[in-house]
């Protein structure tokens, strides 16, 4: 298991939730994605996959090759399906049960397009890759909820801030 520290996405000031601040609208996946992703190799064991999910409270993780190219995704549903089908999973590697039919986005993908993909495919995460399929990050339903919360809090704070008294224009 390794932490992917690659960070080639949008720049700017980040708030405590890791979301951009400073007046720029959050419009792309790169603005809100999780950049520091813990990944696994296709050769890791089923047991290691379960340990990773339990330790980090993940519902899914990304599988990359030695060159950091995305090769698969494992979800908690994939693990449950494997457990239902095969009672003894000793010796089973991640490559035997990871999803290979990958639905991805790039850091420049518009948020509305990413949400549409997640809703239409009924998935809870999208791996974020560059043009050569190198992993840049992940965007999850939790990332969207954090973004929404941050936007709501910002709107509420603006609504609650004292407004400067309006002075009528005087005619000369």
Regions found by a protein language model. Give the residues of each.
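Tandem CBS (Cystathionine beta-synthase) repeat/Bateman regulatory domains
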Residues: 1-172
């Amino acid at each position: 298991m390794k932490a992917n520290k690659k960070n080639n996405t949008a720049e700017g000031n980040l708030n405590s939730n890791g979301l951009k601040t400073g007046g720029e609208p959050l419009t792309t996946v790169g603005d809100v994605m999780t950049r520091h992703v813990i990944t696994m190799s296709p050769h890791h064991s089923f047991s290691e996959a379960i340990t990773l999910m339990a330790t980090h409270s993940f519902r899914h993780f990304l599988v990359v090759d030695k060159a950091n190219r995305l090769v698969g995704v494992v979800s908690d549903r994939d693990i449950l399906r494997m457990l239902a089908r095969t009672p003894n999973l000793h010796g089973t590697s991640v490559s035997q049960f990871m999803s290979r039919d990958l639905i991805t986005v790039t850091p420049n993908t518009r948020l509305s397009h990413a949400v549409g993909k997640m809703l239409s495919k009924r998935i809870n995460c999208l791996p974020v890759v560059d043009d050569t399929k190198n992993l840049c990050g992940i965007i999850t339903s939790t990332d969207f909820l954090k973004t929404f919360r941050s936007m709501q809090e910002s709107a509420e704070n603006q609504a609650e801030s004292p407004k400067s008294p309006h002075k009528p224009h005087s005619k000369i």
